[in-house]
């Protein structure tokens, strides 16, 4: 049984020290697509966190009974089932957001973070640790998405969660929105900036030269 200190380390480690996007460079595609608004970034973060946490838990529970030759198929079946449940819940209770997220919720099935944690961690670790690892990696993923979404929505549209923060010129205000920030490639530059900030704060994360 893992102690509280171990669980805390597993939960908080992926947020900064081993962030799946900033350090491992995983899950970048969805970070480009769903961060033009804070609302979609938050919902996508929650969806991935739920899928990663529970797929880790279920895979860990049966890890000793999965034949090595079919382990990837079993992992993908569990992940796909959870993604379907999450997608149906979103369509039932948050239909407008589900439409905005479009296919990207379904693509969680192939997200490198989810598959990577299932194979590299849940297959070798007890259930509680695996569950907390899934939550931690989901929070780390969400932290980057929300950081990128904050800058893109605020400076690209003058709002946060759809609420006007910077009064736009078109509405008689003073702020001219930067439309470039609403284009998916802008997320590349923002993610790069966040990685630079994190690695300035944590120089041990910088790759060795030569």
Curated annotation (Swiss-Prot):
GO molecular function, one term: oxidoreductase activity, acting on NAD(P)H, quinone or similar compound as acceptor
Source organism superkingdom: Bacteria
EC main group: translocase
Record's signal peptide: none
InterPro entries registered for this protein in UniProt: NqrD (IPR011292), NqrDE/RnfAE (IPR003667)
Membrane topology per record: Multi-pass membrane protein
Catalytic reaction equation(s): a ubiquinone + n Na(+)(in) + NADH + H(+) = a ubiquinol + n Na(+)(out) + NAD(+)
Keywords annotated in UniProt: Cell inner membrane, Cell membrane, Ion transport, Membrane, NAD, Sodium, Sodium transport, Translocase, Transmembrane, Transmembrane helix, Transport, Ubiquinone
EC number annotated for this UniProt entry: 7.2.1.1
BP term (GO), one: sodium ion transport
Pfam family, one: Rnf-Nqr
Function: NQR complex catalyzes the reduction of ubiquinone-1 to ubiquinol by two successive reactions, coupled with the transport of Na(+) ions from the cytoplasm to the periplasm. NqrA to NqrE are probably involved in the second step, the conversion of ubisemiquinone to ubiquinol.
Subunit structure: Composed of six subunits; NqrA, NqrB, NqrC, NqrD, NqrE and NqrF.
Protein name per Swiss-Prot or TrEMBL: Na(+)-translocating NADH-quinone reductase subunit D
């Amino acid at each position: 049984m893992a102690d509280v200190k171990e669980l805390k380390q597993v939960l908080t480690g992926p947020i900064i020290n081993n962030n799946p996007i900033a350090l491992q460079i995983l899950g970048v595609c969805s970070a480009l697509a769903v961060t033009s608004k804070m609302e979609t970034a938050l919902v996508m973060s929650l969806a991935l966190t739920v899928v990663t946490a529970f797929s880790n838990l279920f895979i860990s529970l049966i890890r000793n009974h999965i034949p090595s030759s079919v382990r990837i198929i079993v992992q993908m079946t569990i992940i796909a089932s959870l993604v379907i449940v999450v997608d149906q819940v979103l369509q039932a209770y948050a239909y407008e957001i589900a439409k905005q997220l479009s296919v990207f919720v379904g693509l969680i099935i192939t997200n490198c973070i989810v598959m990577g944690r299932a194979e590299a961690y849940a297959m070798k670790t007890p259930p509680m640790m695996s569950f907390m690892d899934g939550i931690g990696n989901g929070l780390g993923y969400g932290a980057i998405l929300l950081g990128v979404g904050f800058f893109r929505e605020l400076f690209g549209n003058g709002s946060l969660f759809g609420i006007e923060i910077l009064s736009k010129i078109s509405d008689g205000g003073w702020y001219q929105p930067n439309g470039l920030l609403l284009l998916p490639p802008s997320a590349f530059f923002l993610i790069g900036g966040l990685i630079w900030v994190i690695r300035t704060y944590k120089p041990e994360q910088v790759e060795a030269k030569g």
